[in-house]
Amino acid sequence: MTRRYWNINLKEMIEAGVHFGHGIKKWNPKMAPYISAKRKGTHIINLARTARFLSEACDLVFDAASQGKSFLIVGTKKRATDLVASAAIRARCHYVNKKWFSGMLTNWSITKTRLSQFRDLRAEEKMGKFHHLPKRDVAILKRKLSTLQRYLGGIKYMTRLPDIVIVLDQQKEYIALRECAILGIPTISLVDTNCDPDLANISIPANDDTMTSIRLILNKLVFSICEGRSLYIRNR
């Protein structure tokens, strides 16, 4: 894996609140190596470790993107919905930002069937085929299309399992991480002080509750993916 400089600095992370963990009563002992202090009943994350693992993650996604590999970004927190979508679109990644359906990856054949139905319905609507149907049927189809768009819209162009999955909240997206582990898909995950750093291939210790923190980490990863994609295009 090629090592590069990704302009990760401590001041920027402090300003974004990346270092604020959970209350000391909610911690996971496995996170001890990534905690530098306690302040007013809250664990403080060691930002030197954050910088190290974020840099490793950036190197990994850069190398993968430069080889034309695919990514899936998973973040279903309500406040992060728009952030996940815009970041994924910017880097041409697939994304899930509403709800993770159990078996989305492990039952890929079923997911593929749903995606095929979704694409067919979108095509029929665009071609005006709904106009020839009774109003009741049109209402049912539009409702189904709206539901599919809401939950599968971010993966509508996904034709195979992703090469790397990026998870923004380990506890909320635990099922997604387990599915990746079963399938052997490499994962990158933000881990707050109440998380288990052993569940992902690269765990980035960081505040996973504050949008400024999530945005900073995600933007670094997305920038690295974009740089890798540019190299891939130039070398084709």
From Swiss-Prot:
What UniProt keywords are attached to this protein's entry? Chloroplast, Plastid, Ribonucleoprotein, Ribosomal protein
Gene Ontology cellular component list: chloroplast; mitochondrial small ribosomal subunit
Q: Where in the cell is it found?
A: Plastid, Chloroplast
The UniProt entry, under CDD domains, shows: RPS2
InterPro entries xrefs: Ribosomal_uS2 (IPR001865), Ribosomal_uS2_bac/mit/plastid (IPR005706), Ribosomal_uS2_CS (IPR018130), Ribosomal_uS2_flav_dom_sf (IPR023591)
- Pfam family example for this protein? Ribosomal_S2
A single Gene Ontology biological process assigned to it is: translation
Identify the domain of life.
Eukaryota
State any single GO MF term. Answer: structural constituent of ribosome
Protein family membership: Belongs to the universal ribosomal protein uS2 family.
User: What name does the UniProt record give this protein?
Assistant: Small ribosomal subunit protein uS2c
Give the originating organism.
Answer: Triticum aestivum
